[in-house]
């Protein structure tokens, strides 16, 4: 939520208690009849049914949106099952639909891994572009020993930063502007995408940031084979033309 003032946020869930604890003012409980507000029980079919049940409300939520970002974790019931349905409905309303999803840690079990794989296949067919963040790729030395809840929070922060980067490209005027049409030309029908982020400080901050982004553990694909790329560079007032 932090730093996302330029976009409207909507939290969806099949679990009423979990939704109640979500720090987002706009919320929607889906699958009220199907799940009775008790969650999807790690069953993607239940999550899919919940989204279909809320079809009218979801279409209304997508009304007049130019671009819709869908975020969630694959592997469970609600996210895995509902995201492909919501992506399809968003596209029906003409919105550019970008899904940013996390894949489960390998130690979360074979069932969640299998669910995530099947859910990703469906999502690829529904969304314009799917940005995949494998949680296992986040297991760097500096977070390996974190408590599990903090490790999940770290994954959520990466996901949030990815959204903020893309919204900044079109919603905040820069020295080199990229408008919505530019983004659509790259992301419309873009398939699966990866994201890399880097920061730099000191005398070599520009090159350090580029190297960090290009060697990000989140980049599993060879970028030389990419059909397109969105690049967002942010710096202070002292950033030079050479940088």
Please give the residue ranges for each predicted region.
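Tubulin/FtsZ superfamily GTPase core signature
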Residues: 1-243
């Amino acid at each position: 939520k932090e730093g996302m003032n330029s976009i409207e946020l909507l939290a969806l869930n099949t679990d009423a208690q979990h939704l109640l604890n979500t720090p987002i003012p706009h919320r929607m409980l889906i699958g009220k009849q199907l799940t009775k507000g008790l969650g999807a029980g790690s069953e993607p079919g239940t999550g899919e049914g919940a989204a279909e049940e809320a079809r009218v409300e979801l279409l209304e939520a997508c009304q007049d949106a130019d671009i819709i970002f869908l975020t969630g974790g694959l592997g469970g019931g609600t996210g895995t099952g509902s995201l492909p349905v919501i992506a399809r409905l968003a596209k029906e309303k003409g919105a550019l639909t970008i899904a940013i999803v996390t894949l489960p840690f390998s130690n979360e079990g074979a069932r969640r891994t299998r669910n995530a794989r099947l859910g990703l296949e469906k999502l690829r067919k529904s969304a314009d572009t799917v940005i995949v963040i494998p949680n296992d790729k986040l297991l760097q030395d500096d977070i390996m020993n974190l408590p599990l809840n903090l490790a999940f929070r770290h994954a959520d922060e990466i996901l949030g930063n990815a959204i903020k980067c893309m919204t900044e490209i079109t919603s905040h005027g820069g020295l080199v502007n990229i408008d919505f049409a530019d983004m659509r030309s790259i992301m419309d029908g873009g398939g699966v995408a990866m994201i890399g982020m880097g920061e730099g400080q000191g005398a070599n901050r520009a090159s350090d940031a580029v190297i960090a982004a290009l060697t990000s553990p989140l980049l599993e694909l060879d970028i030389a084979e990419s059909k397109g790329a969105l690049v967002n560079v942010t710096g202070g007032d002292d950033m030079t033309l050479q940088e």
